[in-house]
Design a protein with these regions (language model features):
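Acidic (Asp/Glu)-rich catalytic clusters
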Residues: 1-14, 44-46, 88
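Histidine-centered divalent metal-coordination motifs
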Residues: 16, 20
């Protein structure tokens, strides 16, 4: 019931996977099943499209597998980290993702600069 209250108040929900594996060690078909099965189950329960997924342990697969997963599923955002979680880890470090070669300067300006310019204008 708490999740329904959040959804009714404009919050969104995401998934974590079906069986909590280390996703950086999975082949695409298994990774896809982990994400899709969890997404379908949650989406069906709350009659809502699930757009977000977070990797267990923060363990991300390769960039190409992530790109393929986003292309073939309804997931739009995949959250994870590329390094181990330890007490020495900087909690506010923002990890950068690799960019696809098709991500040109126009797209870079559109997605990285324009959102900030709107606040300045």
């Amino acid at each position: 019931n708490q999740i329904r209250v959040l959804l009714n108040n404009g919050f969104d929900i995401g998934i974590h996977t079906k069986s909590h594996p280390f996703c950086n060690k999975l082949e695409f078909d298994v990774l896809n099943e982990e994400i899709i099965a969890s997404s379908r189950r949650l989406g069906k329960k709350f009659n809502r499209k699930v757009n977000f997924a977070s990797y267990p342990f923060g363990a991300r697969p390769s960039f190409n597998l992530e790109k393929k997963l986003i292309t073939k599923s309804q997931i739009q955002v995949l959250l994870g980290i590329n390094s181990k979680i330890t007490n020495e880890r900087e909690p506010f470090k923002w990890e950068r993702d690799k960019q696809d070669s098709s991500y040109n300067s126009v797209n870079w300006l559109r997605f990285n600069c324009l959102p900030y310019l709107k606040y300045l204008l």
